[in-house]
């Protein structure tokens, strides 16, 4: 059975007129359930990601600024979201969802995170609506625990996952396509 990471926290209220389509995180599971593509048994709610798992990928200074909501106005503009405790919690849950999906995929072949794919986050900064790079964090999680020998990240976004590519450029066991 395919497992899909989803949490109500994936939807985060944004200012009126904000261009990010946050509503999709509610609509996707609703539609999949409505059409019978999945059942509630397919969905699981991740917990928050552990700090140490994040720090294998992100700089401690950036992480501390992020979780303490001390990003500068310029850093917030690059990310595209206003700082809030709920947004940080959302990112921690999304990231753990991707780790959980990677573990489930190793055992069962496939898993999905409805809100994963935050590929524009770099070690020392976020950008493009990405605060933490969940894919790089999950890859480092698997490698650190010797759960994978090689990892392929398939990124089909028109903008390319620049953060993931940069974070993994010196890691020969990870290839970003």
Model-derived segments and spans:
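HDAC/HDAC-like amidohydrolase catalytic core signature
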Residues: 1-154, 159-176
């Amino acid at each position: 059975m395919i497992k899909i990471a989803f949490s109500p926290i994936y939807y985060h209220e944004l200012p009126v007129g904000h261009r990010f389509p946050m509503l999709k995180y509610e609509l996707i599971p609703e539609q999949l359930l409505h059409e019978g593509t999945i059942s509630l048994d397919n969905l699981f709610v991740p917990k928050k990601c552990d700090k140490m798992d994040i720090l294998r990928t992100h700089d401690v200074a950036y992480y501390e600024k992020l979780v303490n909501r001390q990003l500068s106005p310029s850093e917030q503009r690059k990310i595209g979201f206003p700082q809030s405790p709920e947004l940080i919690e959302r990112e921690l849950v999304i990231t753990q969802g991707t780790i959980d999906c990677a573990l489930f995929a190793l055992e069962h072949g496939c898993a999905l995170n409805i809100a994963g794919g935050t590929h524009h986050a770099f070690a020392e900064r976020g950008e493009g609506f990405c605060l933490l790079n969940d894919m790089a964090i999950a890859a480092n999680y698997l490698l650190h625990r010797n759960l994978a020998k090689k990892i392929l990240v398939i990124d089909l976004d028109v903008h390319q996952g620049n953060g993931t590519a940069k974070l993994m450029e010196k890691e020969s066991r990870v290839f970003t396509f």
